[in-house]
C-alpha cells in the first residue's frame, strides 16, 4: 500500500466517469476547498472507467455485482495513484479490500426513489400491462410486489441513457434515485416520489461515501470536516443490516435509518426477486448502538424468513 500522493502538492480524487459520479467528485472537491481554504488546482479529479461502466448488456447480478464499479478505482487507491475515491454509497459492497475503508459520508440527499413516467405520472396509475425499466433487483421486486400486472424489463445505462430510452418509448416508466437526479439538476423530470414506507430505498441510497486508506492520517484530517453526523450514524446501521444479510446486487434488500437527536429508527425489508414474498423489520434505539441495531434487525428478519428464503436465487 502506497503513501498519499498529496504530499507532492495535489490531492487526487478518483471517480467513475459518468456525469453523476463527476458531479459528486466536484461537490467533494468544493467542500474540501471550503473547509481548508484550498485553491482549485490543489485538488485533481481523475475519472476512471470501470468494468461496470463497460458491461451494459447484462444485469450486474450476472456479471459480478457491485464490485464491478469499484475494483479499478480501489486498486488505484491502494497503489497510491489517487488519495481518495468518491462513491455512491448504495453501490458499495459491505466488504471492502484490505487496507481501505469508507471513512466519511457527506450529508445525505433525498434517499427516496423517483418514478419518471411516460404514460402515467404516478407509478400506481400505470395502465395494466405497462412496461417499466429497471436494472435494480430491489426495485424490480418492489414493482412486482405492488403491481404484479406490470412487465419489468432490464434497463441499464447512465441517467442520460435511461431518460433517452424512456423518451424513445422503450418503456412506460423507469425509476432512479431522487438524489442522483437532484445532483444533476434534473429534479424536474421526476413525476412521482415513492413513499419509503411502501417503496423502501437501498441501504446507503442518497449518500456519497469517501473511501481512503486505513491509517492515512493526513487524509483523515482533511476529510474530517466533511463528515455528517446523522448520515454517518444512519449508514452505520443500514450497512450493518446489509452486511449481516450478505447483501449484493444478487439480493433484493431495502433499508432506511433516520436519526433524531440521540435516537435512531430503522426499517428494513428483504424480498424474493418475484416480489411474492417480503419480510419487514423495524428497530429503534440510541445512536451509539447504530451498527448493532442494524445487525440485530438483519438477524431478526432472517429468522422471520426462515432458513430457505435465500435458497435458489442468491
From Swiss-Prot:
Q: What SUPFAM superfamilies does the entry give?
A: Periplasmic binding protein-like II, Porphobilinogen deaminase (hydroxymethylbilane synthase), C-terminal domain
**Pfam families on file:** Porphobil_deam, Porphobil_deamC
Instruction: Look up the EC number in the record and give it.
Output: 2.5.1.61
Biochemical pathway? Porphyrin-containing compound metabolism; protoporphyrin-IX biosynthesis; coproporphyrinogen-III from 5-aminolevulinate: step 2/4
* Cofactor mode of binding and number, as noted: Binds 1 dipyrromethane group covalently.
Question: Organism's domain of life?
Answer: Bacteria
GO terms, biological process: protoporphyrinogen IX biosynthetic process
Cellular component (GO) terms are: cytoplasm
- What molecular function terms (GO) are annotated for this protein? hydroxymethylbilane synthase activity
Claim: Repressor is one of the keywords in the record:
no
Q: Which residues carry this modification: S-(dipyrrolylmethanemethyl)cysteine?
A: 249
Q: Does the keyword Transferase apply?
A: yes
Report keywords, A-Z.
Answer: Porphyrin biosynthesis, Transferase
The further comment given in this record reads:
The porphobilinogen subunits are added to the dipyrromethane group.
Assembly: Monomer.
Q: Which protein family is named in the record?
A: Belongs to the HMBS family.
The protein's name: Porphobilinogen deaminase
Amino acid at each position: 500500500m502506497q503513501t498519499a500522493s498529496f504530499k507532492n502538492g495535489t490531492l487526487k480524487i478518483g471517480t467513475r466517469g459518468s456525469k453523476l459520479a463527476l458531479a459528486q467528485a466536484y461537490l467533494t472537491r468544493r467542500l474540501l476547498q471550503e473547509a481548508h481554504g484550498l485553491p482549485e488546482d490543489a485538488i485533481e479529479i481523475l475519472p476512471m472507467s470501470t468494468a461496470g461502466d463497460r458491461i451494459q448488456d447484462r444485469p450486474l447480478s450476472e456479471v459480478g455485482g457491485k464490485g464491478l464499479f469499484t475494483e479499478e478505482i480501489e486498486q488505484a487507491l491502494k497503489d497510491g495513484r489517487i488519495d481518495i475515491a468518491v462513491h455512491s454509497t448504495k453501490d458499495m459492497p459491505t466488504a471492502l479490500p484490505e487496507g481501505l475503508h469508507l471513512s466519511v459520508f457527506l450529508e445525505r440527499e433525498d434517499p427516496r426513489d423517483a418514478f419518471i413516467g411516460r404514460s402515467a405520472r404516478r407509478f400506481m396509475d400505470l395502465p395494466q400491462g405497462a412496461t417499466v425499466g429497471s436494472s435494480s433487483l430491489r426495485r424490480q421486486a418492489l414493482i412486482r410486489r405492488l403491481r404484479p400486472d406490470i412487465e419489468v424489463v432490464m434497463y441499464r445505462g447512465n441517467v442520460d441513457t435511461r431518460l433517452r430510452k424512456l423518451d424513445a418509448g422503450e418503456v412506460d416508466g423507469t425509476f432512479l434515485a431522487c438524489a442522483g437526479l437532484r445532483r444533476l439538476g434534473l429534479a424536474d423530470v421526476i413525476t412521482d416520489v415513492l413513499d419509503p414506507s411502501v417503496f423502501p430505498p437501498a441501504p446507503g441510497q442518497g449518500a456519497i461515501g469517501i473511501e481512503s486508506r486505513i491509517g492515512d492520517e493526513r487524509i483523515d484530517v482533511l476529510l474530517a470536516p466533511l463528515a455528517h453526523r446523522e448520515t454517518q450514524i444512519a449508514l452505520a446501521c443500514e450497512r450493518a443490516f446489509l452486511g449481516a444479510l450478505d447483501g449484493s446486487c444478487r439480493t433484493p434488500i431495502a433499508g432506511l435509518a433516520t436519526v433524531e437527536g440521540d435516537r435512531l429508527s430503522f426499517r428494513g425489508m428483504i424480498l424474493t426477486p418475484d416480489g411474492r414474498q417480503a419480510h419487514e423489520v423495524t428497530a429503534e434505539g440510541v445512536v451509539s448502538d447504530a451498527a448493532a441495531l442494524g445487525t440485530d434487525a438483519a438477524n431478526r428478519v432472517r429468522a422471520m424468513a426462515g432458513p430457505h428464503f435465500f435458497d435458489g436465487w442468491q
